Design a protein with these regions (language model features):
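A short acidic, Gly/Pro-enriched loop at the edge of an enzyme's catalytic core
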Residues: 161-173
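A short glycine-rich, Lys/Arg-flanked "PGG" loop and its adjoining helix->strand segment in the class I
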Residues: 189-201
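Core SAM-dependent methyltransferase catalytic element
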Residues: 244-266
Length: 266
């Protein structure tokens, strides 16, 4: 009797988590129960009833939207999550010799992609792993092992606002949709400066984040000019949200509609 070999697959997760969908769906159910009770047992109070009914419709729409967005991000859908990550990867201008740092590595997806692209490099992934996304150091290490790059990757728990590395430690520094999530730093530009601190002179950087979301980055062009004046002359901004592979349904401000890439050489 032949034995079947079970091939392990890496688990990188989805930017629209099942936990988020469950929470929104639970709120929808809660409003539905309240709405039914109001219409059945409470005479009058029409404005309140209409308000709750609208909340039922809103949360139902949100649940459906997030399910659809999760599908679009997934490999089974339009694979948008991978394509956004690959766009960052394509902007890395590096010969692959030395060390690279991935700030906010999550499940290790970008760290591992870099390790697979640059066979002579060692890649360090850092993340705070507070549990909000379901990622962990263990998952990163397991994904790295499955992908065959565990000997050239390592993962460290660290705060992006206080990286545990000396100045000029890395030949390349990247970050993918992380800075806006860092709670320990209100000023997101400080995170860019901290990332550049550990980059060697002449090293390349690629940072992808919600750079067009003004609540996080109110004066982006001004900060780019400050970086240029500080000596980082080679710096470019790319509007990821205009990419043709991103469906219109995802081009909302809280999804992929405000994503951009800052990249260049220190």
């Amino acid at each position: 009797m032949e034995s079947k070999t079970i091939t392990q697959k890496p688990e990188y997760g989805n930017w629209v988590s099942l936990e988020l969908i469950r929470k929104v769906f639970f709120i929808f159910l809660l409003f539905t129960v309240v709405d039914a009770a109001l219409w059945a047992w409470l005479p009058g109070w029409l404005p309140l009833k209409i308000t709750v009914t609208l909340l039922v419709l809103f949360t139902l729409t949100a649940t459906i939207y997030f399910c659809f967005a999760r599908y679009l991000f997934s490999p089974e859908g339009k694979d948008v999550q991978n394509q956004i990550t690959d766009l960052l990867l394509s902007r890395i201008s590096w010969n692959g010799d030395g060390k690279a740092l991935d700030i906010g590595c999550g499940s290790g997806a970008l760290t591992i992609k870099i390790a697979k692209k640059y066979g002579n490099a060692h890649i360090t992934g850092v993340d705070y792993w507070d549990g909000s996304w379901g990622y962990s150091k263990k998952r990163c290490e397991e994904n790295s092992r499955i992908e065959g790059v565990s000997s050239r990757t390592d993962f460290i728990k660290a705060d992006a606002s206080k990286l545990p590395f000396a100045d000029h430690s890395f030949d390349a520094v990247v970050s993918n949709l992380t800075f806006h999530e860092v709670k320990s730093s209100r000023d997101k530009y400080d995170l860019i400066d901290e990332a550049l601190r550990v980059l060697k002179n002449g090293g390349c950087f690629v940072f992808q984040d919600l750079f067009l979301f003004r609540a996080c980055y109110p004066h982006l062009n001004e900060h780019i000019e400050l970086l240029r004046k500080s000596g980082i002359g080679n710096i470019t901004f790319l509007d990821t949200s205009k990419s043709s592979f991103i469906p219109r349904a995802l081009k909302l401000p809280f999804m992929a509609g405000t994503i951009g890439i800052l990249y260049g050489t220190k």
